[in-house]
Amino acid sequence: MRSSESLQHWFETSLRPRLQRMVAKRRPDLPAPQLLVVAPGVRFSFGEVDRLFHTASAGKPFVAVAAARLAQQGQLSLDAPIGELAPDIDLSALPTAPGVILSRELTLGHLLSHRSGLPDPMEPPRGHSTECSLDRIMRQPDRRWDPAEVVAQCAGLPSLGRPGESFAYGDANYALAQCVLQEVTGLSTHEVLRTQVFQPAGMTRTGQPHSTATDEELAGLQIAPVWVKGAEISHTRALSAGSADGGAVTTLEDMVRFQEALHEGDLLNRDLLACLARPRSRLRAGLHYGTGLATIRFGELMPLVLRGLPEPVGGLGLWAVHCFFYPRQRAHVVMNLHSTAQMRRSFTLHAAIARQLTRLS
C-alpha cells in the first residue's frame, strides 16, 4: 500500500470514528469540528466543510502577505519607519518607552513580528482595561470597530518596550499595520486584503462582513458559531474587532486555496515568504512566530511523545482555528472547533494528524 493510500485509510478508519465519538460527547450548541486535510493523493474532510466560519487570528497572515506583496510591488519597505510610510497617521497618543519617537523608530516589520512594544488592547496588561478587551467588548455587541479605533485603545496602557527590543503578541500590531497599508494604497483595509490576497488567491467566499455588511445581511449570515468565554458572538457587530487584525469569514476550502497560492503558487516570492515564515520569537512552548506566520513545534509540547514531528507553518485563531501548511509533506490542515474552550483539544487533534503525516516524508 502506498503511503498516501495508507494515510487515507487511517483517516477513514481511525480519525473519522474518533471525531464521531467526540461529536457525540459535545454539548448540543457546539457543532462538529470543521476539518479539511489535503495532501498529494489524500483528502479528508469532517463536519460542515462548506459552512462559513471566522478565522480569528488565523487571518493575521492575510495582513502580512498583503504587506509583503506591496513590498514586492515596490510600494513600501517592511523596514521603513511608519512616519515615512504613512506620515498622516498620528502615533503621539500611543505608549512608548522613554526617549522613543515611534514615527521614526517603529517599522512595519516590527508590527508584523509583534516586536513593536505596543500593548494588546484585546487582552490588556493586568490592572488595565479597554473597551475592546475580551471581557468588555460584548457590553456593546452592536458596535462596529475599525483598525484605527482598536489602535486608539492602547492610549493609557503601559509600553512594553522599545521597537524591536522584545516580543509581545497583540492585536494592536496588526490593526496599526492595516492602517499603514490603507494610507499607502489609498484603499480601505478590506479592499487591500481583497485585492492583494483574497482575489489573487482565488478565495471567492472570503470577506469581512462584520465590518462591511448591512445589519440585515449580517443577521442572515450562515456562519458557524463562535463561542468566547461562554458567549456566542458569531453574528454580533462587535466581532468586527476581530477583523482589525485581518480576521475574516471564510471556508476551509478557501483557506487551502490561500495556502496553496502562498506556498506553492506565485502569491509571493520565495525570499519574502521565507522572511514571513522564519521563526523569531516564542509565544509559548510549541508556538513560535515569524513576521506574520506561526510555526508549531509539537516536540516542545510533549517531548517524549511528539519529538521529530514535522513543523507546520500558518495561523492560529482564538476559538481553536488552525490553518497550517506542511512544506515537506505538501499537506494542508485547516480546522475550526468553534470555541475558546476547545483550544487544548484542537492541539491534541492536530498532533494526531501530524504524526500520521510523517508517512508522506
Locations of regions flagged by a protein language model:
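Catalytic tyrosine of NAD(P)H-dependent dehydrogenase/reductases that use a Tyr as the general acid/base
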Residues: 53-56, 167-169
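A short, well-structured edge-of-sheet supersecondary motif
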Residues: 12-55, 78, 293-295, 322-326, ...
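Glycine-rich phosphate/pyrophosphate-binding beta-alpha loops
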Residues: 241-248, 310-325, 332, 337-343
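Short, gly/Ser/Thr-rich active-site loops of penicillin-recognizing serine hydrolases
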Residues: 279, 298-300, 342-361
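Short beta-strand segments enriched in hydrophobic/aromatic residues
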Residues: 181, 262, 327, 336-339
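Active-site SXXK
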Residues: 54-82, 177-182, 255, 330
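Short, surface-exposed loop or secondary-structure junction motifs
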Residues: 29-33, 93-313
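Short, glycine/proline-biased beta-turn/loop segments that scaffold the active-site neighborhood
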Residues: 77-96
